[in-house]
Amino acid sequence: MNVIQNLLSAVSPQPDGDFVDKLNYCATTIGLVLASAFITGWSFVGSPIDCWFPAYYKGWWAEYALDYCYVQNTFFVPFSEDKAERSYNWEQLVADKQNTTSLKQTNQIGYYQWVPFILALQAMLFYFPVVIWRLFYGMAGQNVTSLCNTCTATEGNEESRKGTITTIAGYISQKRHRNLIVKQLSGFQNRANGSAVITSYLFMKALFLINVLFQFVLLKRMLGVDSYFWGAEVTSDLWSGNEWPETGNFPRVTMCEYEVRNLDNIHKHSVQCVLMINMFNEKIFVALWWWLCFLTVVTITNTIYWFWRASGTSVSKNFIRPYVEDIDPKVKNNRGKLQQFVSEFLSPDTVFILRLIELNNGKTPVVELIRDMWRRFNTAVPPPYSAPPLLVKDGAPLLKNFQDESEM
């Protein structure tokens, strides 16, 4: 139980992504872990399989057959088929080797032993993208989780909050700011574009999308179904009142056959078994299939949305502009200054981190961070078009420059 608690705490939501990220790596992972733990517990505590044995099966013989039928695959024979009715004498059915082999291959049930492991594997696949994302932004030198948590902690003392905001603002803008100063002093045109963090985030989004689509392939192969839309088909059958005896969907009653060597002779045996575990497997996997459908839609939409957000400076400017206009209303008459602030002073990573802070902490810390960075920008970067006037008479310029006109 402690292992499960530690695992669930490890996948708890962190403020380094949006709501869809948390649906993928947190909600889905926790649900799969709980389902895997439940099936595992039922396999040990309950009776995942029970078989009907003839009267001459005694003690260890019945135990051996029961264990064998659980670890080996069983096969389903619909009671509604004519062959099943003619073959109610199972010894006669087993004697017909060719028909039995074909029947086993067609209706083989081989997933119930592996359900806990498959669910655990699915949980790891859903958590893997966020591990890559956190590894990459750590390598880029921007601990996004710590930044967002620090913004949450600034809601206390006013003086302490201002100091923390100043530190965060300097931290997330220092790389682009230093590159901008180098450009102005030395004339170098090449500088780091500061997009490592957002590129890593988009890569995580792509991994989430690939993973959720791969889940349909994984379930199809594991359950041995013919269609990727099996979840809808099972739901339709249940809604229409067609239960597993007719459809074969997660059958509760299957056949198991095995061989026993007695001296030089090999005796074949066939028994009928009840897969109680399939009663739970049906509910779990049908619910999982519908959840994956929902997750696919929201993940595709969310991934497209974030790629659009990272598409260019104009999108970033539309995000920054309302904040800057509230801080400095004069910028409404000087769009060039705002453009320079967004395109040269703020890196794509800085704008992205501000978006995450807004998503996880609200607008208040974002306003304070942008106010501090706007102050740094005005201090470090000279105004555009600030050359001396060309014509002067009696110490006064005959033609005011563009910057002077914009400040009037």
UniProtKB/Swiss-Prot annotation:
Residues of this chain annotated as glycosylated in UniProt: N99
Function in brief: Structural component of the gap junctions. Plays a role in oocyte directional transit in the spermatheca during ovulation by facilitating the directional propagation of the calcium signal in the spermatheca. Plays a role in male tail tip morphogenesis.
Annotated protein name in UniProt: Innexin-12
Gene transcribed to yield this protein: inx-12
Membrane-spanning ranges: 29-49, 113-133, 197-217, 284-304
Pfam families xrefs: Innexin (PF00876)
Leader peptide range in chain numbering: none
Main location: membrane
Gene Ontology MF terms in the entry: gap junction channel activity; gap junction hemi-channel activity
Localisation: Cell membrane; Cell junction, Gap junction
